[in-house]
Amino acid sequence: MPELGAPKGINTAPEFVGQKSSTNIMRVVGWGHKPTAKRARQYALEHGLPYVALEDGFLRSLTLASADYPGMAMVVDHQGIYYDARQPSDLEQLINEAPTRQAEALLARARAALESLRMHRLSKYNHAPERKLPARKPCMQRLLIVDQTAEDASVVGGMASPETFLAMLREACAIEGTEVWVKVHPDVIAGKKRGYLLEEARKLGCTLLSDDINPWSLFEQVDGVHVVTSQLGFEALMAGLPVTCHGMPFYAGWGLTDDRQQCPRRGQSRTLEQVFAAAYLEYSRYANPYTQQAATLEEIIQLLADQKRMATRLAGRWQGLEFSGWKQKFIGYFLGPWSQLHFEKKPERALQRLSPQDTGSPPQRILSWAGRTPPERQAQVREAGGELWMMEDGFLRSVGLGVDLTRPLSLVVDDKAMHFDASRASTLEEWLEHHEPSDTELARARRLRERIISLGLSKYNSQDDTLPDLRELAQDREIVLVVGQVESDASIRHACPGIRTNQALLEAARELHPEAYVIYKPHPDVVSGGRVGEVSQTPGTYDLELSKGNISDLFTQIDRLHTLCSLAGFEALIRGVPVTTHGLPFYAGWGLTDDQIDCPRRTRTLSVDALVAGALIEYPIYVDPDRGDLCNAETVVTILERQRTMLRNGTMRLSLPWKTRLYRGYRALFIGKH
């Protein structure tokens, strides 16, 4: 573990207390100052070795640790641990030294990160929903009193005791004109754990709050917060509330809180930005658990915000209608940790399950694969009192083809229309038409776009054959790439009111560019034999057919791309290649493409980065392939890069078992021809 400060060349592989001792052990690592680290601390003391304390950071994960979402932040302390005020800690030293060590650039990052946390309403754990409390009583202030569980090591470390909690509660109740709410851990109410305040709060007639609630939602509905050592107190400071500390948490003693105790090592005033910068930017370390790479605070904020946005939107009960057994294995992951999914084969039974809802309850939802959803299904579901949501592959899908049963890394789920359905507005189209991206959103989209271009990523990323020198073949003629599609695909039916075949597309491109060197690239699924869409060998229609090669490598050698509605048009567009559309894909109609068909609904002129922000960041759902957790676009790009590298060097293979080969033939013969 080089990050702990071991010199280069030293073996840093960890050994565990109880193993045969090694003479080259330089330090002992344990989990904070909790009982589980007692043996490690004792071992360090007996052998005269430094003890290094590890703990979860202040911005941990989407859900609780018990729900198995991995942590993204950790603190490493060589002196003590942040919640033990009985001795110095690295964090305390960082705060003390803040005026001399924190440059303006670091404080600017702190201010921006604070604003991001407020905007995305993020906390250490981010599973709690927004809730509305009853209105305040007239002429009364509302104080929040935060209880803690009895086994919380920060209580003793924060120089507190059970009497401290009781004194805190009694002090709050003695304030005239005050409505006292006590935040009690749900496990305490259920009798699974012990707290400090439950019985006393009941005796004093306080209002008990045991339901999970987003801290930011809670802060908006109280006037002040009293804590002993809970991190909730620091988050209340971030929300601008007055905070009274009855113990000595890491943020007390710096002039930010009303303190009932003192720590002689503290006492110098520090700003909120200084304490935040020390705790979240200097003291904490971050890693993306899905890429297994170090990360910045800003990257973790964005990842958590994306996870929370997707999980919140998709929370609740679902019926998955007519999904194949293969898709059933992974569809549930894309609905997030707060969803419940039941699969149903028969539409009649799914519709019967849509029982009438109470007034104000959200409609029950049916999920269907868009390409297999009959036109009448939406009306049937609506009449039964439900909502139909449709699902399709996302735009950064996989290393390997969907027709070869390669699991996707991204899908899109839409309750309005699919992005390829030009007859009505999808959620993506509405976002592009009505949302005004911020400078931050556009900058993020630009970074993502530039990374995709530099890595040469596309939707499938499976082919890597060397391309010929097209400029030499074209001999100074304009090079036009015509991208074929699967003619039975739902996107052709819904987004192409005019020409609908690859042959007609080639003829239209040749008519517009009679002197050009026309290259035809059929769809990978057609080349693989899995789908229908071959063209005739009409002389003069095209000059070269390229069935192999990564399409992203083609973009550097062509002058223009023609497509019906292929995603390849979007991939070319973000690389600066002029694109002519003969259908109405999601990226047409925004002033970025040469469109042969108009869409009156699309009235804005967008930048490429605004299009990327909607299509690659906001619209899709991304899932980590190893854990099945929600993730985000940047994470999936790194995973795709890693998988493609493994494919190239032979450590990952895309084998085609006999079942897949049989499926290809079956699909080409029966499914792909409707």
Region spans (language model):
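Catalytic-core helical/loop segments in enzymes performing group transfer/polymerization on anionic/lipid-linked
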Residues: M1-H674
